[in-house]
Amino acid sequence: EGWHDLFSLPNGSRDRLPRDALLIEYRTGASTLLRVDDESSGLADLPLAFGYQLTVSEQGAVATWLTIKVPAGKAADLTGSGAVDVALSLAGERHLSERWQLFGQANVAWLGDGDVLADQQQDFAGSLLAGATWNAWQRLELTAQLEANTAVLDTGTDLDGDAVVLSLGGRYRTDSGWACDFGFSEDLQIDASPDIVFVFGVRRAF
């Protein structure tokens, strides 16, 4: 609400809704299949990753890794899924010149029989990512990235469909070790991902 007040944007129905309230609910017909309305804390599912560098050179590198997710969290409060998931990933980068770099990644995951919307869960999910980075000058680099992923759930609605997102952004570095990340993402396959997202971050290397 502070953001809306700062830029004099309309507040919609927010003033009539409870403050600091949480409600995650999925209903079909008269049945409520998922409902979380209280905060929770605790141990989440634990991912264990095993990686291997396939190739590496001055021009680029390729690596692969296997990830196993162990169900240490609780499905009831969404800190876990209640199942073991296994994913295989392959990632690479290629330096075309001093200023241009290509990168990409492919992932496929086998999803175990979980406890969160089990009847709607898919058995497999996949994702692809590809992009290019241009070193505009010594302190500034600009990146364009395209990412797509298949649906994890199948509820018959567009909200949980396959997603395709285009991201544009960059990073500015200072001599003192600070780095500023900025960018935005836009959904190319509508309904299954946020319409537009703005990103800004600051970090410092020590």
Explain the meaning of each model-derived region.
Residues 1-113, 117-206:
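Transmembrane beta-barrel domains of Gram-negative outer membranes and organellar outer membranes
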